[in-house]
Amino acid sequence: MLDYDREAAHYDATRGGNARAGAAADAIETLLPAAAEGVTRIVDAGCGTGIVTVRLARPGRSVIGIDRSAGLAAVAASRLPGRIALGSVIRLPLASGSVDVVTMVWLLHLLSAADSAEAVAEAGRVLSPGGLLITTVGKNDAAFGPADDAAMIVGVVRARFGHDQTDRLNRVIELGRRQGLALAAQTTFVGMGQGVSPRRWRHRLAGDAISWTGAAGRERVDALCAELAGLSDQDRARPDPVYQLAALRKG
């Protein structure tokens, strides 16, 4: 499992940095409710380094970030001083009905089935009536676009041996329904700089970065790497993934 405290210093640089974060924040903006009287209370649950969180902050909003990693939270606090708290997304340190928006960006796919269900339940608990949960869905599916020759090769094996995704849209909708949340809107955004070259796919498959390689077996993974090695332009990044965002409204 990734040591987030140890990774904190260079976490953003290995995950698309400002370009990807900016695209995510811009997409979230299109789903946020129109400005109303008073202050819109936004909580970024699992905020990581705060690279998206800080982009949501502006006059008329009270934005806080929550993360369980002290290392990531420290980076986030340097971006939003006094607005970051240590805490778990399955036990948010917030009163029931106390916020207008909960965002979860690239979070649910990292959690187990049980914890992702708890995270959605917690979002439902802390949201006020009419509030929104805005979350990425199907995060890992985004890398397997039809225009990507390398990903299509990998996708055949992944479809057979990959684990069920805890952030599938239909699953998130069902989890939300149990908490009185209903799908209100969807949008997409491009994961800038996240396209993967055939050589990088081979590197990932050879290491332990992909969870299903153990189930596939070394012989099958080696054959997959050999097929990838036969593609042209080994170091050319393929198209950037297109991520999905869903907004669920509390009734």
What function would you assign to each model-found segment?
Residues 182-251:
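Conserved Class I S-adenosyl-L-methionine
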Residues 41-91:
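Class I SAM-dependent methyltransferase SAM/SAH-binding core
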Residues 117-129:
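A short glycine-rich, Lys/Arg-flanked "PGG" loop and its adjoining helix->strand segment in the class I
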Residues 164-179:
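Short alpha-helix
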Residues 103:
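A conserved beta-strand element that flanks and buttresses the S-adenosyl-L-methionine
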Residues 1-38, 51-55, 72-75, 132-163, 206:
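Conserved class I S-adenosyl-L-methionine
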Residues 106-110:
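Short catalytic micro-motifs in class I SAM-dependent methyltransferases
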